[in-house]
A protein has these predicted regions:
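Hydrophobic alpha-helical transmembrane segments of multi-pass integral membrane proteins
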Residues: 1-147
């Protein structure tokens, strides 16, 4: 039985909404840097846009479309929700590590932690959708053979 559309929509919208927050926050951070209001490394802007906006939107949309294409349901909504937290924490940690006027030794743990969380989120996403695709296609193939 497919995952209810209400649940898929909720997960997708959570990713997309948060992604658009990053889309707006990134240019604000960049503008603050250009105007001298804040001293911010521009790498922080790119982290916000790539991981905060692009990755969040891609993750959210894939959780909506992949189950339908694979004739199944998301393997784990819980993993999708945990992943939402880890990608956000990783993006925020990496943005903070790259944005401040800190010495590299001070920001290194924050940077490594942020990258580790982003990587963990990507691995969770890949595993969750791989299981979704495999189980959905197996179920679909067995129904086709029975018909």
């Amino acid at each position: 039985m497919p995952t209810p559309l209400r649940i898929l929509s909720g997960v997708t919208l959570a990713y997309v909404r948060i992604g658009f927050v990053y889309l707006v926050a990134g240019p604000i951070l960049l503008l603050s840097s250009i105007t001298g209001l804040l001293i911010v490394n521009r790498d922080a802007f790119f982290v916000m846009e790539l991981y905060g906006f692009v990755t969040m939107v891609v993750f959210g949309i894939s959780y909506f479309f992949i189950p339908g294409i694979a004739y199944g349901k998301i393997a784990s909504i819980l993993v999708a929700r945990i992943q939402l937290v880890t990608i956000n924490l990783g993006t925020i940690a990496l943005t903070l590590a790259l944005s401040g006027d800190f010495t590299p030794g001070q920001t290194f743990p924050l940077m490594v932690g942020g990258i580790a969380l982003i990587l963990a989120s990507a691995l969770m996403h890949t595993a969750n959708l791989s299981i979704t695709i495999r189980s959905g296609l197996k179920a679909h193939d067995s129904k086709v053979k029975q018909a």
